[in-house]
Amino acid sequence: MWISDFLNRNRPKDLEFMAESIPRGRAMVLLGRILNRLVSQWAIPGAGRVAVCSPLVGLIAGLGAVAFLRLLALLVHYVLNGLLHFYLPPTGEGVPHAITSPYPWWLVLLVPTLGGLLSGLIVFTWAPEAEGHGTDALIRAFHRGGGQIRGRVPLIKGIASVITIGTGGSAGQEGPIAQIGAGFGSFLARLLRLTPNERRLLMLAGAAGGVGAIFRAPLGGALFACEVLYMTAAMESAALLPCLASSIVAYSTFALFITPSPIFIVPNMAFRGLAELPMFALLALACAGVGWLYVRIFYGLRDYVFKPIPLPRHIKPALGGLLLGLIALIFPQVMTGGYGWVQWGAIGMPPSLLQPHELPFAPQMGVGMLLSLALLKTVTTGLTISSGGSGGVFGPSVFIGGMLGGAVGQLLHGLFPSWNLNPSAFALVGMGGFFAGVSKTPLTSIMMVSEMAGNYSLLVPLMLVCGLNMGLSRRWTLYEEQVPSPVDSPAHQGDFVIDVLEQLRVSQVMVRTEGLELVPAGTPFVEIVRRVAQSTETLFLVVDRQGALSGVFTLRDIRLALEGTEWAPLVVADDLAHRPVLTVTLADDLHTALKRLTELNVDEIPVVAPDDPGQLVGLLHRRELVAAYTTQIDALRSPDPASVL
């Protein structure tokens, strides 16, 4: 494929995704004009409209996070607490209360089933793209959707997720709140008629604000939005500042309504040096193994269980809820997000949340229960979300990683009691390490878990486990829409074509110097026709008496001259030549060469010396240009920097 064809096809492609325009009412048009004028006046030179809009997006994302949590707390209070008499352990931000199991048994089956049914009816009736965990929809909108999210999707996603989680579904909050924030960012960008690239950035800024607020992790939220797009250690660096601005405002807005206390309270822990690293490396191995199982179960249930079932899509989440209820009859801990169970079972309760006969920060679950819950959570999360239910995967991943880390910590503590290992430290590191592997977001995981716990003393083991798990699990991911790197993103392909070609010089490409058709300027037309008939060339180079390049002509010029047969005997090569000659020098970049090839509409272009436009060096064929581009792209994907031209 010729790159110019690719460019022409790729540049307007984002416009094809603008299937949904903003409302055309007079009020919306007027609002758009007002905001456009304000944004234009306040835009900082060099920063642009995205910088001005990001705080506004963060404000709405923060309010969305507050509304989401309030609605979820209300549903949990009336359904799980009131109807099922099910009280989970409090998280670090909660208040002490007794822990109870749900009853009666038939309601444990009925409530998640009805929740799945209601969620499925809402989603598949009004916004089918809101099914699942939501983050993939955000990633897809960035890479392939031009930053477009339908206006109804955030609302439908939020309502359906509140119902799913509030009725016991095993799902988290990051997917819904990311879509709520991203949806407003996309809407505002459409309202202001921003470019596709600006729309993508505002969409990410909205996601960052929502995630940063709801998890009390503003830096982690900003990193998440930039990092979750790619499978490798890459991130959308252009979005970092907008995401930071949005996350700061969203977190501050959230703090006006809900005290931003740490979600987990951990004891004073310290990393004691090199001797502990092998122990945490074992945790990374465990995280990689369970992470592989988690991804296989998650998509295996979708592809081989729920898809083949001959039921309407609206009904399948109810089936997932019923199956979850069957497991919850024996293990109610797998219902909802379950952060409180991680605090109580794997870390231990702080003094402020202790129940009678409990010791401070003493994990209340043994190795067997912790491992059982970690494995069962992989199944129940798949039953909830892979059936078409609505909710995120970060919460369940934190649950699985925390339980797995707590189990590994207790096991190692029992094997090596003299080392005085802290199982709570392994639980905290397991949360971040596990999510880093399944989501391919190591920096996010390190910062998010540290901020959620308000503790940065375990940064070194967190870095180790996240890094090792990333390396061990590079072949699978929980987010199907991720691409390996920006080079592979449709959102950046046009940029990379231009950027890569601008990095390469004509001197780095094979220029043909033999077999050229040099035609003296005074050559008669009859001789020209004879030479053309015997040649396989398509571009003919006209030279003067000194051998300097003075023009070029093509087969089309010959055909045009033949139409005026009465003048043909008087025509010489100099009459056919195009002037001024479009050439490139050895010092020109390949992007310049591509543009001139396109202007001439030919396969080859003359290459001349940099200091003498008449001194012909050879011909550059577009085939060699494409080959150089392909080689450079492959080199950029290669881990060996020496392979880059």
What label would you give each PLM region?
Residues 1-503, 507-515, 520-528, 537-539, ...:
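Alpha-helical transmembrane segments and immediately membrane-proximal extracytoplasmic
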Residues 482-515, 529-533, 549, 554-605, ...:
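Tandem CBS (Bateman) regulatory domains
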